[in-house]
Amino acid sequence: MDKKDLFDQITEVTRNTEDLLNKLHETQSAMVEIMEENAELQIENQHLRERLKQATAAENEGTKNTKYGLSKSLQNLEKLYASGYHVCNEFYGKHRQDEEECAFCLTVIYGDR
Amino acid sequence: MEDLKNLTNQAVEKQPEIVKRFNEMIDSQHLSHAYLLTGAGGIGKKDVAQWVAMRLFCIDLQGSMPCGECEECTRIISGQHPDVVEIAPDGQSIKVEQVRFLKAEFSKSGVEGARKVFIIEQANKMTTSAANSLLKFIEEPSGEVTAFLLAENRSLMLPTIVSRTEIIELKPLPKDRLIKELTEQNIAETDARILTRLTNDTSEIQTLVDNNWILDAHKALEKWFITATTGDITAFVDVQTRVMALAKDRFYQEKILDLMMLYAMDLLELKFDQETITYEANRRQLQELADQTNVRQLLAVADVLLPLKHQLSQNLNFQSVVEKATIKICNIFKMRGR
Amino acid sequence: MKFTIARNTFIKKLNAVQRAISSKTTIPILTGLKIEAEEDRLILTGSNTDISIETTISTNDEEAHLNIESTGAVVLTARFFGDIVKKLPDNTMLLEVKDGFQTTITSGASEFKINGLDANNFPHLPEVDSQTTITLKADVFSEMINETVIAVSNQESRPILTGIHFTIEGNKLSAVATDSHRLSQRVINLPEPIKMPEDIIIPGKSLLELSRMLDDEIDTITLQISENQALFTFDETLFYSRLLEGLYPDTSRLIPKESSTEMEFEAPELLASIERASLLSHAGRNNVVKLTINAANKQAIISGDSPEVGNVEEEVVTKDIVGEDLEISFNPDYLKDALRSFGHTSIKMAFTSALRPFTLVPTEDQENFIQLITPVRTF
C-alpha cells in the first residue's frame, strides 16, 4: 500500500470512528430519554392505580399518613425519587445523574408543610 | 463589498413574496419565535433568514429594506454578528458540541442588545434527541428571540418541531431567473436550459457543471441518440464506450436517464409544432427526425425510456437497462436508416 | 492610527484583556484584540462574547509614555500579537496601521508587519446607562463570588443553574447558587438603599474570571446592569458579562426553617476530620461519610466505610451539641468546599432529619451567609 492510500485509509477510518462515536452519543441520549419517559409513565401509572384504589374503596377514609408521616402520594414520589428520578418542579421526570441527591426533590417530599 | 450587496438582493429577488410577508410581520410586530423554512437547495432559505436578521438589526434601513452596507448588515452577511447565531452540519450531522453551543446561546442574553436570531441550516440533520432538547427553547424562549430552522422538506423534520414552528414554504425559483443566473456564471445558455430541466437545486447544478460533466454528457448522448434513431445498432456500443464513463453513481445515472427522456420529449414537441425545446443546439437535426417519423413511433420511444428510472430504482444494472433500451429504439427506427 | 507606548504598561494591560480572548471561537474576529486610539487614550478590548474586557490607557498616565500621533482602530490576532509584544527588544514600541489594516510594530531594531482586521466587525459592547450603580468593596465582592460559586452547577443541561443569582432590594445584595445538591447564599449590606430592585443571573464562569482580576490593589468595584449585560468597573477596566435568561428557581424554600439537632464547632477542626475521612471514601466506590450525633453525651463521630479499602472513625471536637440524636450521611467533598469557604471561624450546623438538607452558618453572623448540603440516602 503506498503512502497516499495509507493516508486515505486512515482518514477513512477516522471518519468512520467519528461517525460511530456520534451514533453512540445519539443512542446514549435516546436511551436516557426513554428511561425518562418510562419514569414519567411510571408516575402516571402510579397515579392512575391510586385513583383506581380510591374509586373502588370509597369507604377508605382519605389518605392515611404512614412512614415518616408521609401521605400516599408523597410516598409515591419518594419511591420514584429513590428509583433515580427527579420529582421536583424544576426537573420533574428527569433522570438523576449518578443518583445525586436533589435538594429540590427532598424539599418536595419531606419539606415543611 | 460588491458581492455582499448581491447577497442582500438575493433574498429579495429569489423570494420577493416571502420577504414581503416578513416585512409585514416585522412592521406589525407579529414575528414568531420560530420558523421552519422549507424548499430545495439554492432556493434562498438562508438568504431569507439572513435578510430578516438584517431587517431587524440594520441601523440604516432604506424604507423597509436593510441597507446591506452598515456594520450590522455586513457582519450578518459575513457570519460575524455575535447575536446572529448560525449553525450548519459539520459533515454528516449537526454534532453534539454544536447542539451544546446552541443551547448555551439560547440560554444567554444577547451580546450587543436584547435581540437574538438563530439560523440552523439543514435542521433535519439534528439527531432526534438534539432536536427534542431544543424544543424547550423554541417553545418558550426568553427574550426577543427568532429562530430559523432550514430544511429541504418539512417531512424530514420531527413532528414535535413542525408543530411548534411557523412553516414557510419557499417557492421554486422561476426557470428564466435560474437560467439567467447560470449564464452569469459562464455556463452556456443551451447548457443552462438543459440543466434547469434536470433540477432546480443549485447545489445539484453545481455538481453537474463540475468537471464539465454536463458538457460531456450532452455530447455523448447526442451521438448516442442520433445513432440510435437512425436505426444504427452501433449505438449499442456507444453505451459502453461513451455513456458508461459518465454514469459514475446512482445520481449521475438518473440524470443520464433524464437527459435521454428529454430527447424523446423534444421530438414530440417538434412533431406538434411547439416552440420551446430543450436541445436547442440540435433543433435542425431533431426537426428533420420528427418530420420523418410518425407519432406512433415517437410515443414508442417514450414508452421505452419512461420505465428505465423505475427499473434502476429496483437495482437493475444500469448498463444492461440502457443497452436493452438502445436495441429497442434501434428497432423502432430500423427502416429509417436504410 | 499611530502611537508609541512603554512596552511594560502595554503588556500589563494586554494581559488583563487577554483573559477574555479565546482561540476557540465561532466568530473568527474574536480571536483578535481590538486596539483603538482616541485623542487622549488608548482602548484595548477582548471578548469571547460571554465576557468582554475593555481597558484604557490614558496619555496622562506617566508610566505609559503614551503618545498618540493619529487616531484609528484595528483588530490584531491576540495570540501572536501578544507573543510579539512580549519579545520586542526595546522599552518602547511604535504601532502604526496603514491602509488595508496592515500593522507595523517597531521596537529598537526590530520591525514586524502583520495583517489586521476591520475593527468595525468587532462586537459592539452595549452602552450601559442604567440608573442603578452599585459600589462595592472589591475584596468583599470577590469573597462573595468565591463563597457562592462553589455551588454553581457545571451541567449544561440546566443552563440557569450554571449562574449565580443576584437580587438587589433595598440595601441588600444577595447572591445564591445551587446545583440542586447544595446551595450557597451570601448577603451583603449596601451603604445606601437602591431605588429599583434588580434580579439577574450571571454565569459562574464569568464571575470566577472577574474575581481572579480583583487583586489587592483594587479597592472598589461598581456594578451596573443593562438589559443584556452586567458591567463591572474597576480602575481603568470595564468587565462585561452576558446574563443567563430565564427564571431562577425559588431557593428560599430549600432552607429549612426549624431544626431538631444543632452542633457548633470551629470550621478548621471539622475540615481536618472530614479531609481524613474522605481519604477512604474517595478510594471506595461511593463517596460518602457518616456523621453520628449522640446529643446526650455531646459526642459527634465521623466515620467512613469502604468495604474494598477499609474504614475510619474519629470523634470530632465540637463546642456544643443540642437536640436529638442523629445519623446522617453526605458527600464529604461538599462539606469540605463549604467549610473552606468559611475560613477560620466558628460554625453552627443545623439538621432537621437524616433525609433533609442541613445548613452551616457562621456563629457570629447567622443571617447573611449560609451553606446548605443535601444528605445521601443510605437505605
UniProtKB/Swiss-Prot annotation, chain A:
<dbReference type="InterPro" id="IPR010377">
    <property type="entry name" value="YabA"/>
</dbReference>
<dbReference type="GO" id="GO:0009295">
    <property type="term" value="C:nucleoid"/>
</dbReference>
<keyword id="KW-0235">DNA replication</keyword>
<protein>
    <recommendedName>
        <fullName>Replication initiation control protein YabA</fullName>
    </recommendedName>
</protein>
<comment type="similarity">
    <text>Belongs to the YabA family.</text>
</comment>
<comment type="function">
    <text>Involved in control of chromosome replication initiation. Inhibits the cooperative binding of DnaA to the oriC region, thus negatively regulating initiation of chromosome replication. Inhibits the ability of DnaA-ATP to form a helix on DNA; does not disassemble preformed DnaA-DNA helices. Decreases the residence time of DnaA on the chromosome at its binding sites (oriC, replication forks and promoter-binding sites). Tethers DnaA to the replication machinery via the DNA polymerase beta sliding clamp subunit (dnaN).</text>
</comment>
<feature type="binding site">
    <location>
        <position position="105"/>
    </location>
    <ligand>
        <name>Zn(2+)</name>
    </ligand>
</feature>
<keyword id="KW-0862">Zinc</keyword>
<dbReference type="GO" id="GO:0006260">
    <property type="term" value="P:DNA replication"/>
</dbReference>
<feature type="binding site">
    <location>
        <position position="86"/>
    </location>
    <ligand>
        <name>Zn(2+)</name>
    </ligand>
</feature>
<feature type="binding site">
    <location>
        <position position="88"/>
    </location>
    <ligand>
        <name>Zn(2+)</name>
    </ligand>
</feature>
<keyword id="KW-0236">DNA replication inhibitor</keyword>
<feature type="binding site">
    <location>
        <position position="102"/>
    </location>
    <ligand>
        <name>Zn(2+)</name>
    </ligand>
</feature>
<comment type="subunit">
    <text>Homotetramer. Interacts with both DnaA and DnaN, acting as a bridge between these two proteins.</text>
</comment>
<keyword id="KW-0963">Cytoplasm</keyword>
<dbReference type="Pfam" id="PF06156">
    <property type="entry name" value="YabA"/>
</dbReference>
<keyword id="KW-0479">Metal-binding</keyword>
